Amino acid sequence: ALPVAVLGAGPVGLAAAAQLIERGIPFVIVEAAATVGANLLDYGHVRLFSPWRYDIDPAMARLLQPTGWQAPSADELPLAGEVVQRVLEPFAQLPQVASVLQLSTKVIAVTRQGFDKVKSAGRENAPFVIRAVRGGRTFELKARAVIDSTGTWNTPNPVGASGLPAIGEPELADRIFYGIPDVLGAHRSRYAGQRTLVVGAGHSAANALLALAELAGQAPGTRLLWSVRSPVLTRVFGGGDADALPARGALGSSLRSLRDSGGLTFQ
């Protein structure tokens, strides 16, 4: 039987693999990066607002337990990098995972065998064909089903409106950081004493703004500007003390206080 193809070896992809193992379903994992959890490592310095109890798939935990793996404290808030180090990497080393894990393999197309773009009758019964590139070599593999867990981290929303880059944005790419920079660590020199514009109203923006505010207290001349598309900030401010995840509520409350105190220029 053809395997299920899991695209992406992050927390979702590896959780899917764990579920497939417990159900006895053959699978293969295809990951573009050279390591599992690569997207989490991009913001490995950020503390998550979801505690460990929500960050580990139960099937993964069950498969890890016979190896002597120690589960983290359920109520502890991990750094993103710790999720990789303490869960994803040990899971990826299990023989039943390591034997089917293809790292440094970028998927460039997914289609159905024998069907082009204008044929549809019977398409749902045909195997999937996955075209990928590894080490400069292009190859194909077949699958009975595909689980796309690649995420959107590597395709960030551009600064401009309507899903388009702002005019001049591509030319200034070296001045723009998409994601959550390590403002107080590896990227400190880039932002200390500078005026920085943060665009967005999600939790990535909230983390960046609060880190920049802390940096401003340490490095004179550091200034913050915050720009959003919508004046409705309910999502990023969260539920405060009533938030189902207390750390998420605290993050939003801290950002609200920063804005209200005049610690940044809001527009």
Model-derived segments and spans:
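Conserved Rossmann-like nucleotide-cofactor binding loop
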Residues: V12, T35, W153, S204, ...
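Glycine-rich dinucleotide-binding loop and its adjacent helix/turn
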Residues: D148-Q218, L224
